[in-house]
Amino acid sequence: MNFLIIGGDAAGMSAASRAKRHQPDLDVTVLEKTADVSYSACGMPYNIADPDRSIEDLVVRRAEVFRQKQGIDLLTGIEATSIDPAVKSVNTRDADGQARTFRYDTLLMAPGAAPLTPAIPGIDLPGVMVLKSLAHGRAIKQFIDQWAVRKTVIIGMGYIALEMCEALRERSIAVDMVKPRETFLPWMEARLAEQVKAEA
């Protein structure tokens, strides 16, 4: 019995670990297109705020630990390109462009979310970044250090945007925030939102 999981982020690895605990003889394979698994994504803004900390401090468990200690076949750098439910197979491609097909008895899709980027001119220019994965966190931290960044603009006012604003201010980087909606912090109670706005 082969349990195949597409996506090695929090949901995918939790499912893989739980499946092995309940059925130790189950063959569990996880396909992750990035090089990173099992890291504290919520800690990225706080890590970026501290220039003395390595972004690698956020890694909770390396891929080889899942293989050696839990018997989970975790393959990184492999992207699923198509699924054929009729024959229960997933076609993939690795970073070198090599194709490979995986068979499954049960398939779980856990690819995670992708950041929304507005369709505006210049969105693909150097220095325009998103924060979703550990690779994004690495790139942001490296860019700040390499270019001695002193001013940034953040599009959005969700939780991560606000945490990044605070993190950048900790590093003495000026921040302008652009809100896509007319109301300030629409997901927050109005009186509290006004208090946050007054103190910002």
Residue positions per predicted region:
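Conserved beta-strand termini and adjacent loop/short-helix elements that scaffold enzyme active sites
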Residues: 31, 77-79, 131, 157, ...
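Beta1-alpha1 glycine-rich phosphate/pyrophosphate-binding loop at the start
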Residues: 1-73, 165-191
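Mid-domain beta-loop-alpha active-site segment that forms a flexible
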Residues: 159-165
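FAD-binding core/adjacent interface of flavoenzyme oxidoreductases
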Residues: 1-4, 24, 60, 64-151
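Short, conserved glycine- and acidic-residue-centered signature motifs
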Residues: 121, 130-133, 161, 189, ...
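Active-site-proximal cofactor/substrate-binding loop regions of enzyme domains
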Residues: 151-152, 186, 192, 199
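Glycine-rich Rossmann-fold phosphate-binding loop(s) that bind the pyrophosphate
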Residues: 7-11, 132-133, 155-158
